[in-house]
């Protein structure tokens, strides 16, 4: 029994993480590359379907959006840094964003019970995509 307790206590806590992805520039290609990048970092990555949505708060073409659920023992700040690096690697930049061109936007919506990006939770497509992930 003591051996089992020791073994259990050495396991790192896996955090339940919900990630949103969006793109309105070369969207199919950028979403595919973002999916691949997330799968390389998180072997258990599961994705919702991809929805086309009208832009909210910016002028520009429609977006492709989806959600991704992963588990990791990494702290929140490391996950955020990783996703921001993915954005840059996939061609996103502040200059392009100012022109309404979003190559890829990768945001952490939830880290365990902590909700981030409160306005994103109000977007009508989020519940639809969440339902996809809960049906798995």
Question: Can you describe what each PLM-predicted range is?
Answer:
Residues 14-41, 48-54:
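N-terminal beta1-alpha1 ligand-phosphate binding loop
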Residues 21-23, 68-74, 110-113:
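Short beta-strand-to-loop capping motifs
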Residues 24, 47, 68, 129:
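A residue-level signal for conserved active-site and pocket-lining positions in enzyme catalytic cores
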Residues 28-30, 74-81:
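Short, conserved charged micro-motifs
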Residues 46-49, 110:
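Structural signal for conserved beta-strand scaffold positions within catalytic alpha/beta enzyme cores
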Residues 55-64, 77-136:
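Flexible, gly/pro- and Lys/Arg-enriched active-site loops
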């Amino acid at each position: 029994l003591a051996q089992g307790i020791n073994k259990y206590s050495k396991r790192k806590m896996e955090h339940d993480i919900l990630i949103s992805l969006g793109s309105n520039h070369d969207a199919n290609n950028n979403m595919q590359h973002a999916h691949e990048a997330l799968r390389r970092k998180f072997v258990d990555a599961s994705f919702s379907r991809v929805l086309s949505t009208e832009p909210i708060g910016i002028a520009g073409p429609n977006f492709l959006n989806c959600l991704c659920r992963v588990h990791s023992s990494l702290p929140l700040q490391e996950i955020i840094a990783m996703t921001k690096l993915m954005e840059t690697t996939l061609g996103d930049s502040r200059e392009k964003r100012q022109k309404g061109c979003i190559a890829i936007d990768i945001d952490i919506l939830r880290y365990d019970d902590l909700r981030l990006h409160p306005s994103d939770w109000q977007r009508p497509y989020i519940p639809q995509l969440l339902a996809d992930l809960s049906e798995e």
